[in-house]
Design a protein with these regions (language model features):
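ADP-ribose/NAD+-binding catalytic cleft of ART/PARP-like enzymes
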Residues: 1-28, 44
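Short, flexible beta-strand-to-coil junctions
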Residues: 7-14, 34, 55-60
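Active-site and NAD+-binding cores of ADP-ribose-processing enzymes
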Residues: 25, 47-101
Length: 101
């Protein structure tokens, strides 16, 4: 059964994601969260101001909880999807911008 999850990345990746989807990282998964604001936390910590959050709909049985991120620090659970996410599985795009201090 398909379920919604969220993936965040620097906003500059929008065009590539629209064209090619979301590719797995070097560890073999696409990281996902259950809420968009949770996904943002993983990118904002790297200093990005403009962040793209992709809402995706993927098969739940292909998603597993990952334990390589601190749930206490990020205040959320993280999940890994074991395939690339094709553009048709992306249901919406959200832009987040944080003020530069």
């Amino acid at each position: 059964m398909a379920r919604k999850y969220y993936h965040a990345t620097p906003f500059e990746n929008l065009e590539s994601i629209i064209d090619q989807g979301i590719h797995r990282g070097c560890d073999g998964v696409v990281y996902l969260t259950e809420k968009p604001e949770e996904a943002v936390r993983f990118v904002v910590i790297r200093g990005y101001v403009d962040i793209l959050v992709c809402e995706v709909q993927v098969e739940e049985d292909m998603v597993e909880e990952t334990f390589d991120h601190s749930e206490a620090f990020f205040k959320c659970r993280a999940y890994g999807y074991s395939e690339d996410i094709i553009p048709d599985e992306i249901t919406s795009y959200i832009k987040y911008s944080r003020p530069v201090s």
